């Protein structure tokens, strides 16, 4: 197989033009080869001449002869590495593995265990995806919160109500990344997510995909129980014996995968009481910022709209004078700011996009790093206490609605009274307020400095009427559940997994960690 890199075409090229370009590059007839796109990225450094840049793998009969006659540093021989799931171990497993949580980590752990014959049982405290969507829509419209089924909890996890980004910075030579994208495509995602530089699905598409993954798992012997919250774990001599559900039912189990998600605070508290080792983890907090999407497009594309490129996205970072980092996170082109609360009397926000990314605003979190030294205590749950305090203040400031402030007023530390040209694109009620008043001073100062710095990179980013809303507090898990190189916690049979356990950040990396934990289990235990 031949790999070609740095293959550039105009952004409005056709598939035929790509095929012809490959033929010219390899100096071979157009009908003599097949190809697969490995990667597509955008080069917009020259706004008047934007290019898609491709990496492609080409299968051609006379590969050696072509490589001899074509001397080009961007052309090389390559071999495709195929992902291999391990063979089952020898330890007898009496009961099916229990997986707590049906986010990407739990779903992908369940998928691979089911495929290998382990008949996993998935417990999910929230509702099935379609019912969950109805519950979330009702919350956004009427403010009635279901603490167990919301933007954070329910089938698909917190990522279901997000932009659905699938890119990850995790380097994985074992091929799990490609496995995740392949499974998404087989569950209904568009084929191009496999090779796009910044693939995304959108909330409307993700809901159907996670339901399809569930059906696949069930067809392979797995099972699901919704509105089934793990409320306790019962141990005997350092080994897992039972999983308690809804404070009543006890399920015998030798293996339990904790794919909890980053917001399962009550579960973290229970695990801490039960002596499961965990530690506080640095994370980041801040606000959502909204700008006109047309402005971001102009900054990055040199035009307000381009049918071949869609809504533009950005990523910005800055190191502040106080030593803290401030950066954009979970940027949602053509998206919405959403009320992402999961506890009564506390308010958190997140960003979300549909597949079309056709809202008039771009939004992103602007977040500032915080560490255990910022937390009110040095216990494993100190970060949770820090989050809860900020969310309580946000809820009180907006009286249950999302508090919003113009950047010009944020700089003056005064409540906003009217919108400028930028108007909110939000899911859930909102109210003009002084958002800065609830932030720790270091966080507020860092966001102001960051906004001004980003305005020097992206024209208009620091405009007076840019909207800030909060609080963005669920950027990653505030704890890490300690696990060994075999994937186990200090309690035999407990496997921490995914973002909530502190081993991932985002949909794809969480799914990859789910596969990794499935491998740990398979390497040790026999299947049924």
Show which residues each predicted segment covers.
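Residues forming the flavin
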Residues: 1-50, 56-161, 165-528
């Amino acid at each position: 197989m031949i790999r070609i890199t740095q293959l550039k075409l105009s952004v409005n090229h056709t598939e035929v033009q790509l095929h012809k370009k490959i033929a010219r590059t390899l100096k071979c007839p157009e009908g003599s080869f097949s190809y697969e796109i490995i990667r597509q990225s955008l080069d917009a450094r020259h706004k008047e001449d934007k290019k898609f840049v491709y990496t492609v793998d080409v299968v051609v009969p006379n590969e050696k002869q072509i490589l001899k006659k074509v001397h080009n540093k961007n052309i090389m021989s390559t071999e495709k590495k195929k992902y291999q799931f391990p063979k089952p171990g020898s330890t007898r497993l009496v009961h099916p593995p229990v997986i707590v949580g049906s986010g990407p980590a739990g779903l992908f752990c369940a998928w691979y265990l089911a495929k290998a014959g382990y008949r996993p049982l998935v417990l999910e405290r929230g509702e099935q995806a379609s019912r969950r969507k109805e519950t979330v829509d009702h919350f956004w419209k009427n403010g009635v919160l279901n603490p167990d089924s919301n933007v954070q909890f329910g089938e698909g996890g917190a990522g279901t109500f997000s932009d659905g980004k699938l890119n990850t910075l995790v380097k994985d030579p074992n091929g799990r990344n490609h496995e995740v994208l392949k499974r998404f495509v087989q569950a209904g995602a568009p084929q191009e997510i496999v090779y796009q530089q910044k693939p995304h699905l959108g909330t409307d598409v993700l809901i159907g995909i996670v339901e399809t993954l569930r059906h696949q798992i069930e067809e392979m012997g797995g099972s699901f129980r919704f509105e089934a919250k793990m409320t306790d774990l019962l141990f005997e001599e350092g080994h897992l014996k039972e999983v308690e559900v809804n404070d009543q039912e006890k399920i015998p189990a030798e293996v339990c995968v904790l794919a909890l998600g980053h917001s399962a605070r009550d579960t973290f508290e229970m695990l801490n009481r039960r002596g499961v080792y965990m530690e506080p983890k640095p994370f980041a907090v801040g606000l959502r910022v909204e700008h006109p999407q047309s402005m971001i497009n102009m900054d990055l594309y040199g035009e307000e709209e381009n049918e071949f490129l869609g809504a533009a996205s950005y990523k910005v970072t800055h190191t502040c004078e106080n030593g803290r980092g401030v950066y954009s996170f979970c940027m949602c082109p053509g998206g919405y700011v959403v009320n992402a609360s999961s506890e009564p009397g506390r308010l958190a926000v997140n960003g979300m996009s549909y597949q079309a990314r056709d809202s008039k605003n771009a939004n992103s979190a602007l977040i500032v790093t915080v560490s255990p030294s910022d937390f009110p205590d040095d216990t494993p749950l100190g970060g949770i206490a820090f989050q809860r305090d900020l969310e309580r203040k946000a809820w009180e400031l907006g009286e249950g609605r999302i508090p919003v402030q113009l950047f010009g007023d944020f700089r003056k530390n005064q409540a906003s009274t009217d919108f400028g040209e930028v108007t909110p694109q939000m899911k859930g009620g909102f109210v003009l307020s002084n958002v800065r008043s609830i932030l720790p001073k270091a966080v507020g100062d860092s966001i102001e400095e960051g906004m001004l710095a980003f305005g020097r990179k992206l024209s208009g980013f620091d405009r007076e009427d840019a909207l800030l809303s909060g609080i963005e507090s669920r950027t990653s898990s505030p704890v890490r559940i300690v696990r060994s190189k075999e994937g186990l916690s200090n309690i035999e049979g407990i496997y921490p997994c995914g973002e909530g356990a502190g081993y991932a950040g985002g949909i794809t990396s969480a799914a990859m960690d789910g596969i990794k934990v499935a491998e740990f289990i398979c390497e040790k235990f026999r299947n049924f």
